[in-house]
UniProtKB/Swiss-Prot annotation:
This is Uncharacterized ATP-binding protein MJ0074. Keywords: ATP-binding, Nucleotide-binding. Signal peptide: none annotated. ATP binds at residues 29-36. The lineage of its organism: Archaea, Methanobacteriati, Methanobacteriota, Methanomada group, Methanococci. Belongs to the archaeal ATPase family. GO terms for molecular function: ATP binding; ATP hydrolysis activity. SMART domains: AAA. It comes from Methanocaldococcus jannaschii (strain ATCC 43067 / DSM 2661 / JAL-1 / JCM 10045 / NBRC 100440).
Length: 358
């Protein structure tokens, strides 16, 4: 399928890339809002391949629990006497981005043996500087960064990474750094992190607004040779809102199924999930960590919080006690925008399930 819209976000990211690196950028948004698709569109179709070298690390693809896993994500081993920059130059002729930084076998063995991030970062910096000397601008993109949020290597790895990213951008102006995440609690933690104050920027990739969602339906209908009336499009939006993945599923399924049947199937599925979530709370009391305290959550407090969404899609964060919204965000029922300090359901389907069930 052709890429649709996001021209505003694309223009902003290209504008950032045309400047000297100076900030770490965090790209966040609800689940399935199109963050990865946006970045892939930029990497594959919008960048001058003669000007940029992109390293794209997708952490969702690898289970990371120890130092060796982290190294496996970052590096691609090779044998021979070629310099890493020569390997990179030969690779980027054929692919738009690299999924690891080339490292000679003996160098990689040494990095694995010493088990310190200092050696890792020193090697990466050397490679990035060599790329810069070749007249190209390196870009690091880390997708689902929160996967290493609690991992420790001589202290929390994430803080060492933040310091390193700040060094690459704010201090050395060497490399653009973009971190993607759909974990809004992680983004809230990052947003309030003192070491990143004045050194990081945040880009929200949200679900489509109504106008764009309706245009997306027209686009998909044309792509799939489907006829959608205005009433059909309004019905789709009322059920799934502007969630690109949900809209795509509904339009494509409606090619050979009744539209209302497809929509009711999705909604009933979401209602069943929410019902089960609430039923489990009759038998267990979840706990969440807030600061240095572990707080127990009551079912009554969760229901009270969810009922606030009966008549509103968005509410101020302060309207729900912190432990309760933390739990609901962890369970992917709510999404938190830390910049605007608002909470909303992860999707229109979740919102409709809340309204039907409560």
């Amino acid at each position: 399928m052709k890429f649709f819209d996001r021209e505003k976000e694309i223009a902003e990211i290209l504008h950032i890339l045309n400047r000297e690196p100076d900030d770490v950028y965090f790209i966040y948004g609800p689940i399935n809002s199109g963050k990865t698709a946006l970045i892939n569109e930029i990497i594959n179709n919008r960048l001058d391949k003669d000007k940029y070298v992109v390293f794209y690390f997708d952490l969702r693809e690898i289970f990371i629990s120890k130092y060796d896993d982290f190294i496996e994500v970052l590096f691609e081993e090779y044998e021979g006497n070629k310099k890493p920059v020569e390997i990179i130059k030969s690779l980027i002729k054929d692919v738009p981005s690299l999924c690891g930084i080339p490292a000679p076998k003996n160098t990689l063995e040494e990095i694995l043996k010493k088990k310190t991030t200092k050696n890792v970062f020193r090697y990466i910096t050397k490679v990035l500087m060599d790329i810069k000397k070749e007249g190209k601008q390196p870009i690091l993109i880390i997708d689902e960064l929160q996967k290493i949020g609690d991992m420790k290597i001589n202290g929390f790895l994430i803080y060492e990474l933040f310091n390193y990213f700040v060094s690459l951008t704010k201090h050395k102006h060497l490399c653009h750094v973009f971190c993607l995440s759909s974990d809004s609690l992680f983004i809230e933690r990052v947003y309030n992190e003192a070491m990143l104050d004045g050194r990081a920027k945040y880009l929200l990739v949200d679900d489509f607004d109504k106008e764009t969602a309706l245009k997306f339906m027209d686009f998909l209908a044309k792509e799939n040779n489907i006829s959608l009336t205005n009433e059909d499009k309004e019905l789709i939006y009322n059920y799934v809102g502007g969630k690109p993945k949900d809209i795509k599923y509904v339009v494509e399924e409606s090619n050979f199924k009744d539209l209302k049947e497809v929509l009711d199937y999705l909604l009933n599925d979401e209602i069943s999930k929410l019902d089960m979530f609430l039923e489990i709370l009759d038998y267990s009391k979840p706990r969440v960590e807030v600061g240095n305290e572990v707080i127990e959550i009551n079912k009554e407090d969760i229901i009270k919080a969810l009922r606030l969404f009966k008549d509103k899609y968005e509410i101020p964060k302060k309207d729900i006690p912190t432990p309760v919204y933390v739990y609901l965000v962890k369970e992917n029922i709510l999404f938190l925008n830390p910049q605007k300090r608002i909470l909303k359901p992860q999707s229109y389907l979740v919102w409709n399930a809340i309204k039907r069930l409560l």
